[in-house]
Amino acid sequence: MKIFHDFSHRAFIFCYISTMKKVFYLKTCDTCLKILKKFNLKDWELREIKINPITEEEVEQMHKLAGSYEAFFSKKSNQIKLRELDPKKLTEEDYKELILDHYTFLKRPVFMTDNEIFIGNDKKNLEALRSYFAD
C-alpha cells in the first residue's frame, strides 16, 4: 500500500492505492488447492467460484489481461460434453457467455492483479507464478 501526500492544502490528504489481487479457484479441485498452498496469499482475495460466481466485470478484466476469452476457457469442462459443444466452432463471444453461465468453464486457478494474470496449472504458468511471488 502506498501513501501519497498532497502538500498543496493546509491539511494532509491521504490517498490509498490498493492493488487488486484475486485468486479464482474451486474448493473441490485438488490441483487448485495444491497450487494455492504453495504461495503466501495473505493479501489476496480468495474466490471460490462455485459459491461466489465470477462477474462480468471480472471476466472483462481477465480478457483485457489475457488478450482473449479463449485463454481462460476450460476445454476440459464436463459441460462441453453435456451441452454437446464443439470448442473448435466457438467464438470469442461464446467463450465469454459460457464462462459467465457456468463456473466449470473457467480455467483454474486464475491469479489476477491489476496488471498481470496467471491462468491454469500448466508448468509454464506455475513457473511464472513462482517468479511473481519471489519478487
Language-model regions, residue ranges each:
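Local sequence-structure signature of Cys/Sec-based thiol-disulfide redox active-site neighborhoods
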Residues: M20-L41, L46-I49
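Thiol/selenol-based redox catalytic cores and closely related redox-interacting motifs
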Residues: N52-L129, F133-D135
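Short, positively charged and aromatic/hydrophobic N-terminal segments
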Residues: I13-I17
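Cationic, amphipathic, low-complexity segments that mediate targeting or membrane/lipid association
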Residues: M1-H9
